[in-house]
A protein has these predicted regions:
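Single conserved hydrophobic/aromatic residue that forms the stacking wall/gate
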Residues: 1-6, 10
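Short beta-strand elements in bilobed, periplasmic/extracellular small-molecule ligand-binding domains
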Residues: 11-32
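Residues on one face of amphipathic alpha-helical coiled coils
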Residues: 12, 48, 67, 104, ...
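Short, high-confidence coil segments that cap the C-terminus of an alpha-helix
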Residues: 15, 49-51, 221
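Switch II of P-loop NTPase G domains
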Residues: 29-44, 229-251
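Accessory, often N-terminal, substrate/partner-engagement and coupling regions
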Residues: 40-111
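Conserved C-terminal guanine-recognition region of P-loop GTPase G domains, centered on the G4
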Residues: 60-70, 221, 244-251
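Conserved G1/Walker A P-loop phosphate-binding module
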Residues: 126-130, 134-145, 149-233, 237, ...
C-alpha cells in the first residue's frame, strides 16, 4: 500500500517495488488495517508479483501486523519499521546509535508474540533462563534490561549535550538552526556557508545528529550555525524521541 512518493523512499533503501495497491476507507480495520477481503487480494497480488515483503505506508498495530502476516504468508512492514531501518543505517555517533536502538527495541517489544525464536537469534546470547520460563519471556526480559541501560546511557549523553549548549550560550554568539525536510539540502547549505565538511548524500536521514559550526557574517558578526536531522511527513509518534537532539537545538 504505497504512494508513489513512498515507493521512492523504499527504492532508495535498495528495495525493488514490484506492485502497488491503493485503498480508500473511512477508518482502518482494527484487525487487519485494510480488511480481510483486501488483505486476501494483496496476498494474491503478492503471489503473482513474487514479492518477499509487503510494506504499508502507515503505522500498523502489533496485532494488525501479526494478523496480516498470517494472511499474506510473508513479512509485513509498516512505515515505522522502514524509517527505523533508515535510522539504523545512518547512525554514527554514540548517542545516535543508542537512540536508534532504543526506538527499535520499543517497536519490537509489543511485537514479540509468536516471534520469540526469531528475535533471540537476532540479539545473540540470551543468558540463563529461569525455571519454567518460555523463550518469549526470556526475550521480553532481555529487551527490557537493554532498554533500561540505553535510557541510562542516553540520560548521561543528553546531560553532556546540555552543558555544551550552555557553553555556547555563554559565548554570546547567536545560534542559527537549519531546519527542514530530510534530503532537502541542509547539510549542503551548512558546508557551503562554513566549509564544515559534513557528510552530504542523496538519501534520507543522512544526518542524524546535530552539527554546529561557526560562521562569520559579512558585517563581521560571528554566529553558530547548526545542521539538524531532517523531518518527514507522517512521522510516527514513537519516533519523535529520536529527533530530540534536533528539537533541543532548535529550542
Amino acid at each position: 500500500l504505497l504512494s508513489s512518493a513512498a515507493s521512492d523512499v523504499y527504492k532508495r533503501q535498495g528495495a525493488d517495488p514490484v506492485s502497488r495497491v491503493v485503498q480508500k476507507r473511512e477508518a482502518p480495520d482494527p484487525a487487519t488495517f485494510v480488511g480481510k477481503g483486501k488483505a486476501s487480494e494483496i496476498q494474491e497480488e503478492s503471489d503473482q508479483a513474487d514479492a518477499d515483503t509487503v510494506v504499508f505506508d502507515d503505522e500498523l498495530s502489533p496485532a494488525q501486523q501479526f494478523n496480516l502476516e498470517k494472511i499474506l504468508k510473508r513479512s509485513a512492514l509498516d512505515r515505522t519499521a522502514v524509517i527505523l531501518d533508515i535510522f539504523a543505517q545512518n547512525a554514527t555517533t554514540l548517542e545516535g546509535k543508542a537512540q536508534v536502538e532504543l526506538a527499535q527495541l520499543k517497536y519490537r517489544l509489543p511485537r514479540l508474540r509468536g516471534r520469540g525464536n526469531q528475535l533471540s537469534q537476532q540479539g545473540g546470547g540470551i543468558g540463563t533462563r529461569g525455571p519454567g520460563e518460555t523463550q518469549l519471556e526470556v526475550d521480553r526480559r532481555r529487551i527490557q534490561r537493554r532498554l533500561a541501560k540505553l535510557e541510562k546511557d542516553l540520560t548521561g549523553l543528553r546531560r553532556t549535550r546540555k552543558n555544551q549548549r550552555k557553553s555556547r550560550r555563554r559565548s554570546r554568539f547567536h545560534t542559527v538552526a537549519i531546519v527542514g525536510y530530510t534530503n532537502a539540502g541542509k547539510s549542503t547549505l551548512l558546508n557551503r556557508l562554513t566549509g564544515a565538511g559534513v557528510m552530504v548524500e542523496d538519501r534520507l536521514f543522512a544526518t542524524l545528529d546535530a552539527t554546529t559550526r561557526r560562521l562569520q557574517l559579512p558585517g563581521g558578526e560571528t554566529v553558530l550555525m547548526t545542521d539538524t536531522v531532517g523531518f518527514i511527513q507522517k512521522l510516527p509518534t514513537d519516533l519523535v524521541e529520536a529527533f530530540k537532539s534536533t528539537l533541543e537545538e532548535v529550542g
